[in-house]
C-alpha cells in the first residue's frame, strides 16, 4: 500500500501522509452485511465517562465481519476489497459457492478472484482458516481464536501476524506480535498469512482536524486543569504541586504495580517484557 505525501502549502500539509486507496475495488458495502452504529461518546449506560477523549467524528456504518469462519468445506471467491471505517485493516467480501456472502479481514497477497476455504481439510495458503492442529509449525497466522468456536480475538489489526512455534498435547505455542509466547488450545482456529494494510503505522495524522474527524478529542494535561478536576490541577502559573505524578483517579502514574500479586497466567510461556515467564 503506497503512502501519499503533499506539497507543504500549509504547515500541517508538510507532515501529513495519507493512505493510497488503490487496492480498494468498491465504495459501496454489501447492504445485507451492514448495520447502524450508535455513538457512545465514551460513556456507559448510566452516562458516566468510561473512556476519555472519545466523541464526535464522522458517522459510520458497522460492517459485520465473519470472525468464526464456520462454513467448513464450502469454497468462496474474493469478490471485493473494501475500506472499513471501524478498523485499520481492509476487509474483503467472499462469495460462497452456496450463495452466501460474508466479510473477512483482508490478508496480504489475497486478490480478487482468489479462492479461500475454511475447515480442517483446507489447503495451507493465504486466507484459508484451519484449526491450529492442522497448521504446520513455523506458519505465520492471523485472526486467532482464544476459545474454541468463539471467533477470532487476537492478531486482527493492520500489518500484524503471529507465528505458530510448537504443539504440545492439547495446546499450541504461539508467538504474538508483541513478542509474547502463549499457549492456545490446539482446536482453536486461525487464518493463514499476515493482515493487510502493512504500511498503516507509517501514516502521520498531521493536524487536529483529522483527529477530530476520527472521533478523538484532545488530551488535556492534568497540570493545566483546576484543582477540582485533577489531582495535579490548580496553583498559580506553572505549578508543580510538590507531589508525584498522578492519574485523574489519584493513582501514582509511574511505577505503581496494579496487578494482584497472587495472579498467575499459566498460559503465558514467555512474557513480552524482557522475555520473563508469565506471572
UniProtKB/Swiss-Prot annotation:
UniProt record, GO biological process: cytoplasmic translation
Alphabetically, the GO molecular function entries are: rRNA binding; structural constituent of ribosome; transferase activity
InterPro entries reported for this sequence: NA-bd_OB-fold (IPR012340), Rib_uL2_dom2 (IPR014722), Ribosomal_uL2 (IPR002171), Ribosomal_uL2_bac/org-type (IPR005880), Ribosomal_uL2_C (IPR022669), Ribosomal_uL2_CS (IPR022671), Ribosomal_uL2_dom3 (IPR014726), Ribosomal_uL2_RNA-bd_dom (IPR022666)
Could you list this entry's UniProt keywords, alphabetically sorted.
Answer: Ribonucleoprotein, Ribosomal protein, RNA-binding, rRNA-binding
Which superkingdom heads the taxonomic lineage of this protein's source?
Answer: Bacteria
Q: Does the keyword rRNA-binding apply?
A: yes
Q: What Pfam families does the annotation carry?
A: Ribosomal_L2, Ribosomal_L2_C
| A GO cellular component entry from the record | large ribosomal subunit
Ranges for the region named Disordered are 224-279
> PANTHER family this protein is in?
LARGE RIBOSOMAL SUBUNIT PROTEIN UL2M, RIBOSOMAL PROTEIN L2
Extract the NCBIfam families matched here.
rplB_bact
Q: Which HAMAP family match?
A: Ribosomal_uL2_B
Q: Name the protein family.
A: Belongs to the universal ribosomal protein uL2 family.
Summary of the function given for this chain in its UniProt record: One of the primary rRNA binding proteins. Required for association of the 30S and 50S subunits to form the 70S ribosome, for tRNA binding and peptide bond formation. It has been suggested to have peptidyltransferase activity; this is somewhat controversial. Makes several contacts with the 16S rRNA in the 70S ribosome.
Query: What is its quaternary makeup?
Result: Part of the 50S ribosomal subunit. Forms a bridge to the 30S subunit in the 70S ribosome.
State the name under which the record lists this protein. Large ribosomal subunit protein uL2
UniProt organism field: Elusimicrobium minutum (strain Pei191)
Q: Which gene encodes it?
A: rplB
Amino acid at each position: 500500500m503506497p503512502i501519499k505525501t503533499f506539497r507543504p502549502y500549509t504547515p500541517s500539509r508538510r507532515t501529513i501522509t495519507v493512505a493510497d486507496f488503490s487496492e480498494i475495488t468498491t465504495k459501496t458495502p454489501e447492504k445485507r452485511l451492514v448495520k447502524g452504529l450508535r455513538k457512545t461518546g465514551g460513556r456507559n449506560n448510566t452516562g458516566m465517562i468510561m473512556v476519555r477523549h472519545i466523541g464526535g467524528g464522522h458517522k459510520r456504518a458497522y460492517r459485520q465481519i465473519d470472525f468464526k469462519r464456520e462454513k467448513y468445506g464450502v469454497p468462496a471467491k474474493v469478490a471485493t476489497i473494501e475500506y472499513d471505517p471501524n478498523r485499520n485493516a481492509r476487509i474483503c467480501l467472499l462469495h460462497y459457492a452456496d450463495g452466501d456472502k460474508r466479510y473477512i479481514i483482508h490478508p496480504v497477497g489475497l486478490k480478487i478472484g482468489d479462492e479461500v476455504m475454511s475447515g480442517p481439510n483446507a489447503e495451507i495458503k493465504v486466507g484459508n482458516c484451519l484449526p491450529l492442529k492442522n497448521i504446520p509449525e513455523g506458519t505465520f497466522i492471523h485472526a486467532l481464536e482464544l476459545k474454541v468456536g468463539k471467533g477470532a480475538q487476537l492478531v486482527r489489526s493492520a500489518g500484524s501476524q503471529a507465528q505458530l512455534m510448537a504443539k504440545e498435547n492439547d495446546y499450541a505455542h504461539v508467538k504474538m506480535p508483541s513478542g509474547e509466547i502463549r499457549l492456545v488450545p490446539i482446536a482453536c482456529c486461525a487464518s493463514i498469512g499476515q493482515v493487510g494494510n502493512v504500511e498503516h503505522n507509517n501514516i502521520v495524522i498531521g493536524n487536529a482536524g483529522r483527529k477530530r474527524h476520527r472521533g478523538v478529542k484532545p488530551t488535556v494535561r492534568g497540570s493545566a486543569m483546576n484543582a477540582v478536576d485533577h489531582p495535579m490541577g490548580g496553583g498559580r502559573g506553572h505549578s508543580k504541586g510538590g507531589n508525584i505524578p498522578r492519574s485523574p483517579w489519584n493513582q501514582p502514574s509511574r511505577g505503581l504495580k496494579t496487578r494482584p500479586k497472587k495472579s498467575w497466567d499459566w498460559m503465558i510461556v514467555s512474557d513480552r517484557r524482557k522475555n520473563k515467564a508469565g506471572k
